[in-house]
Amino acid sequence: MTVKTRSNIAKKIEKDGGPETQYLAVDPNEIIQLQEESKKIPYKMEIVWRNVALFAALHFAAAIGLYQLIFEAKWQTVIFTFLLYVFGGFGITAGAHRLWSHKSYKATTPMRIFLMILNNIALQNDVIEWARDHRCHHKWTDTDADPHNTTRGFFFAHMGWLLVRKHPQVKEQGAKLDMSDLLSDPVLVFQRKHYFPLVILCCFILPTIIPVYFWKETAFIAFYTAGTFRYCFTLHATWCINSAAHYFGWKPYDSSITPVENVFTTIAAVGEGGHNFHHTFPQDYRTSEYSLKYNWTRVLIDTAAALGLVYDRKTACDEIIGRQVSNHGCDIQRGKSIM
């Protein structure tokens, strides 16, 4: 990332008709300082073999589930598995990401409870833990304080970061982040306190019981399709944002940073693949300029807003986006991001 150019990015966003300072905006001086510190401290990745074994077992189980989904499962189970993937994805995209990590909109208590339940289906750490890592990623992108630092390679950014101990800078900088907004949310406090039983119930037990009870699917098929395969697929959809959406795509909004626009990840992660836009305007609740047919998460948020469950949706105004593209991006490439 070219820090000097990155510092010129527009940091204004619209809220209730007026601009405010962009949340999680990058501080170029802080980035330079972290990069200099990293040069002085030798670091060797330490593999966590327990995690390696668990992920290996999960992928073996997911392979069984994929076979069952294609050749053995009832059509109701196939649809149910897809719906669980979509709504579990919403628990990450609309919940942990856009609402709680970026504060890009506000939600009523019923909506926050709904998103917390969906987040349990996804099983990607409790929201407070997830949001802290994600805020580190945005504040210190591509430094050693970034949990899935892309300078360590595609595999590390994708899932390797979960197979090794966190870099000391991730822990040190993460401890400095203000997480009081999340720690004071009773919905998230409840989730953190009861996380293990909640995720076992929402991610595995209910996805197994529901097909068995309602359409007489076998427990074996239900567990491996709606449970393990769906869970593993959702993980990779999320991980592709950290990897593929930093490597393969175009940069309409800021050519100096690693995040790119990637249609595949937009589809796989229910609307999250406009990553160059998102890192340029991290508090825009839309996360991209993609149309609603690609941005399913925005559809959910807008629908909830129409029902009075969501409010204060923040967006970057067209004038600021246009100026940013003209100064640091590419108008032609922007056209590919408005589909």
From Swiss-Prot:
Q: Which tissues is this chain's protein expressed in?
A: Expressed in the intestine in adult worms and in all four larval stages. Additional expression in the hypodermis in all life stages.
Instruction: Name the GO cellular-component terms.
Output: endoplasmic reticulum membrane
Which pathway is this protein engaged in? Lipid metabolism; monounsaturated fatty acid biosynthesis; Lipid metabolism; fatty acid metabolism
For this protein, what is the EC number?
Answer: 1.14.19.-, 1.14.19.1
The miscellaneous remark of the record is: Cytochrome b5 CYTB-5.1 is specifically required for the desaturase activity, its knockdown or mutation alters the enzyme activity.
What's the stated role of this polypeptide? Delta(9)-fatty acid desaturase that acts preferentially on stearoyl-CoA (octadecanoyl-CoA) producing the monounsaturated oleoyl-CoA ((9Z)-octadecenoyl-CoA), one of the most abundant monounsaturated fatty acid in Caenorhabditis elegans phospholipids and triacylglycerols. Also acts on palmitoyl-CoA (hexadecanoyl-CoA), heptadecanoyl-CoA and (11E)-octadecenoyl-CoA (trans-vaccenoyl-CoA), the monounsaturated fatty acids (MUFAs) produced are further used as substrates to synthesize polyunsaturated fatty acids (PUFAs) by several other desaturases and elongases.
Name of the protein described by the UniProt record? Delta(9)-fatty-acid desaturase fat-6
Q: Which organism is it from?
A: Caenorhabditis elegans
Name of the coding gene: fat-6
